[in-house]
Amino acid sequence: MSPELYNIFYESHRGSWAILIILFLVSYFLIKAGKGKAGKILHMIVRLFFVIMLITGAGMLVYWQFAFLFIVKGVLAIVLIYAMEMLLTRTSKGTIGQQARIYWIVFITCLVLVALIGYNVISF
């Protein structure tokens, strides 16, 4: 893979994460406020960004030849995506209950770890 292609994946990945987190939070609070239709539209856009994250992340994983640290980051990112999806889906259905606290803890923990690994603060 050429460095130019890697740069495209990297910039798309990094910028899309910021947009994804903002859209996720807006969608969540719209759903909590009872504005279901607007929340559902944003939820669909969030799902599109999930796909973008997975494709660009896989491209970068290939570039780095499946280094262990980036495999760990990928697994954490998938858990993060799962937590975001469960928070949005179960909140909109009204079935989140006591599990909301657990999903928020998983969301925040994975988000911090993925960001720290992504910006090379954590490395091994």
Swiss-Prot record:
It comes from Halalkalibacterium halodurans (strain ATCC BAA-125 / DSM 18197 / FERM 7344 / JCM 9153 / C-125). InterPro entries: UPF0344 (IPR010899). It holds the Pfam family DUF1516. This is UPF0344 protein BH2983. Its main location: membrane. It comes from the Bacteria. It is found in: Cell membrane. Keywords: Cell membrane, Membrane, Transmembrane, Transmembrane helix. The chain crosses the membrane at residues 15-35, 40-60, 61-81, 102-122. The lineage of its organism: Bacteria, Bacillati, Bacillota, Bacilli, Bacillales. The keyword Metal-binding does not apply. GO terms for cellular component: plasma membrane. It is a multi-pass membrane protein. Belongs to the UPF0344 family.
